[in-house]
């Protein structure tokens, strides 16, 4: 008996260590993707004034659209590959490829090279979300995923928050050359790729531990689903399908601010300068650190693992914030603009992380978590194309009117699913739920 308890204790300690390690390295990996993702949005400020590389706003918008289209294709594709080959292979390849593409963009300033590299960046960066969410799902049980993924989802808010001023400082304060936005960002991603190689594993079984949740094993002779079969299975799940549509409607606003925030601020407030124009939109991402944590706690603790109520309420508040943003900019008050950016960050990043992370994993089940998450994020990435295109072709008033309408529609779509819970959901276990180690509970 003592030997059995000792084995359980060692197993629990090992699992806890790996859970912390996986949480940290996957958090860093996705945050790192934002350095190469935000490099072009910062470089736009210098490119617009560089006579040797003439790109107008519409051309920049077209490049963003190329990137986002490739990103959308990758989201649909890499989720299936993560299920088939594991997170390690898919995400590590994405990190290395993204860094290489950024190095090329910082070295060769021609439109054909930029166009090709934006496509490569889209495909490379889209390896991250579905694979890393699957990685987290493998190490954490259903009852705790809401708050765990809520905390973990701060990675992309933090990544965007740090990446933009970092690239702006390197490009316009350290070197006065927009190319450094790409080169410095590539260096960060390469460093994280090295850490990922040494510290990441795809699932507990890869380090000799049992799965955190016991699931019925498929028959030994069951055929392995192909790519199209896995996607069709996701499409037949009404929860996953509605999540995909809602994410399609939500994503344009976020990406317009991410990709065009510095340009929008600089055009209306040129007196504050390029570095400050790159920093002001960071209020959106500072708030994004809190949004996923708050919505994750709310969904698990207040709504009993129901993901939709917290999303609906947050999206309603986002609708109001988006409607007020243009009047705030017309007032000329920088403090009011920053305050609304902060409010938009809280109310957008929360449902963004919940819809694309915990909800997609829960309703997709662990067997096809990567595929379901990839499908939902692929839908969002198609919507994000509008976020990259619209600010380059239309005035700010029109753009934010569209975003207000899409946020409202997304909230209304989720209302009928208010009481939905994932099939695997159960009350937080005290002595019986979960896999072998979780079933035993923490050794006393």
Where do the protein language model's features map onto the residues?
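Extracytoplasmic
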Residues: 21-55, 257-262, 352
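Conserved MFS/SLC helix-loop-helix module at the cytosolic interface between two early adjacent transmembrane helices
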Residues: 73-111
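Cytoplasmic membrane-interface "Motif A"-like loop-to-helix N-cap segments
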Residues: 84-95, 301-315
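Helix-loop-helix hairpin linking two adjacent transmembrane segments in secondary transporters
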Residues: 152-204
């Amino acid at each position: 008996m003592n030997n059995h308890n000792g084995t359980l204790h060692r197993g629990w300690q090992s699992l806890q260590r790996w859970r912390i390690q996986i949480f940290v390295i996957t958090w860093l990996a996705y945050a790192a993707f934002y350095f190469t993702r935000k490099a072009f949005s910062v470089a736009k400020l210098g490119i617009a004034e560089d006579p040797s590389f003439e790109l107008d706003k519409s051309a920049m918008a077209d490049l963003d659209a190329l990137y986002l289209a490739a990103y959308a294709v990758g989201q649909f594709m890499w989720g299936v590959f993560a299920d088939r080959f594991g997170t390690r292979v898919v995400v590590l390849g994405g990190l290395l490829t993204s860094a290489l593409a950024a190095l090329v963009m910082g070295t060769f300033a021609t439109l054909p090279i930029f166009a090709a590299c934006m496509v490569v960046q889209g495909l490379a960066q889209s390896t991250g979300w579905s694979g890393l969410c699957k990685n987290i799902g493998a190490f954490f049980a259903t009852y705790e995923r809401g708050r765990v993924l809520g905390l973990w989802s701060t990675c992309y808010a933090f990544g965007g928050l740090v990446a933009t001023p970092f690239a702006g400082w390197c490009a316009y304060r350290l070197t006065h050359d927009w190319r450094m936005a790409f080169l410095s960002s590539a260096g960060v991603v390469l460093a994280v790729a090295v850490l990922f190689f040494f510290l990441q594993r795809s699932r507990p079984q890869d380090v000799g531990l049992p799965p955190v949740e016991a699931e019925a094993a498929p028959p030994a002779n069951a055929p392995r689903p192909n790519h199209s079969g896995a996607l069709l299975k996701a499409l037949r799940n009404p929860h996953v399908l509605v999540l995909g549509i809602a994410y399609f409607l939500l994503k344009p606003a976020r990406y317009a601010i991410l990709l065009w925030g510095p340009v929008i601020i600089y055009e209306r407030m040129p007196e504050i300068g390029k570095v400050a124009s790159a920093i002001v939109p960071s209020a959106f991402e500072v708030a994004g650190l809190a949004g996923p944590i708050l919505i994750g706690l709310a969904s698990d603790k207040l709504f009993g693992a129901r993901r939709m109520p917290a999303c609906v309420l947050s999206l309603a508040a986002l609708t109001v914030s988006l409607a007020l943003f243009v009047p705030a900019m017309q007032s000329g008050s920088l403090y009011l603009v920053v305050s609304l950016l902060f409010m938009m960050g809280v109310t957008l990043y929360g449902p963004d992380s919940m819809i694309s992370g915990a909800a997609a994993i829960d309703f997709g089940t662990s067997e096809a978590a990567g595929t379901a998450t990839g499908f939902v994020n692929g839908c969002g990435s198609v919507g994000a194309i509008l976020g990259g295109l619209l600010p380059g072709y239309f005035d700010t008033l029109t753009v934010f009117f569209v975003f207000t309408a899409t946020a409202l529609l997304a909230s209304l779509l989720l209302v009928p699913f208010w009481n939905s819970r994932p099939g695997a959901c159960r009350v937080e276990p005290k002595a019986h739920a979960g896999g072998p180690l979780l079933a035993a509970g923490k050794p006393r």
